[in-house]
Structure formats: structure tokens, C-alpha cells
Amino acid sequence: MALDKLLEHEAQAEIERIRAEARDRAQQILASARERADALLESRRRLLETQRQAALVRARSAADLELSAARLTASEQGMAEVYRLVEGHLREITGLPEYREILARLIAEARQAIPEAEAVEVNPADLALARELVTDLSVRENPAIQGGVRVVARGGKSGITNTLAGRLDRLRGELAPQVSRLLAE
């Protein structure tokens, strides 16, 4: 019977050893699974954080772009309004006493550009004034001319227009940054 007890005891010891190994192996598997799960969770968390940061950057960029577009639109509208006001004031200049001197300068500048002039064209409202200022050339009406003069070269095929509005148009590019800055203040 001692042999039975000895075999039983050895079998019980073997069972305990196998159980202990199984527990150790199960704990290792469990620890490894936890480690992989934690790594996967951390990886997903980093990915989500990266995506969140990218979404924030995109949202900020979109907002900045929208703000810039709104500012540009406001600036363009403001510039257009400024030029409308200036053009209105330029049209009013023709009714001021100083316009005689202004028209005389515009005529002189245009005639310098075309020394062989045939005629001077002005707005019908400026015809009498232009005839006082120009005595050596024909002075004709041209309703298309506003606030200035057109000097026609001999033969009538070419000419030069020198108007206040034309000068404003030529300076528009130079004035735009200054006007924008003033509107922004």
C-alpha cells in the first residue's frame, strides 16, 4: 500500500506542478495580452490625438482663410467705396473756380505729348472755358471726356486723353496699399 500512497503522492505532486506551470503560463499569457491591449490602446489614443490635432489645424486654417477672405472682401468693398467717393469729388471739381487752372494744366500736358496737335476735345460743359484757354487750335465737344481734355494729333488717327479720372485710374495701383492701410485703421 505504501507503493499506492507513493504513486498517489507523486501523481498529486505532478498534478500540482502541472497546475503551477499552467497558472504561470496563464499569467504570462494574460500579462502579454494586457501589454498588447495597453500598447494597442496607446497606439489608438496617439492616432486619435494626431487626428484631433490635424483636425484642429485644418479648422484653424479654414477659419483663417475665411477671415482673410472676409477681410479681403471688406477691403475691396471699402476700396471701391473710396474710389466712388473720389470719382464723385473729381466730377464736382469741374464746377469750382480752380477748375480753370486745372484744365489749363491738363491741356498743356497733353499738348506737350502731342506737339503737332490738330484739335482739343472737351466735355460740352467745358467748351467755353477751353476756347478761352486754347486759341491756336480747334476746340471740339466730346461728351465722353469728363474733367479733362483729349488732344487729337494731325490726321485725327491718334490722340492723348488727360483727365482727372484717368489720372486716378493710373495711380490706383500705387494708392491701393495706402488706402487699404487707412481703411484697416
Swiss-Prot record:
Look up the coiled coil feature and give its residue ranges: none
Q: Which Gene Ontology BP annotations are present?
A: proton motive force-driven plasma membrane ATP synthesis
Gene Ontology terms: cellular component:
proton-transporting two-sector ATPase complex, catalytic domain
- Any S-S bridges, and between which cysteines? none
Which keywords fit this entry according to its UniProt record?
Answer: ATP synthesis, Hydrogen ion transport, Ion transport, Transport
Instruction: Name the protein family.
Output: Belongs to the V-ATPase E subunit family.
Report the protein name in the record: V-type ATP synthase subunit E
Q: What is the lineage of its organism?
A: Bacteria, Thermotogati, Deinococcota, Deinococci, Deinococcales
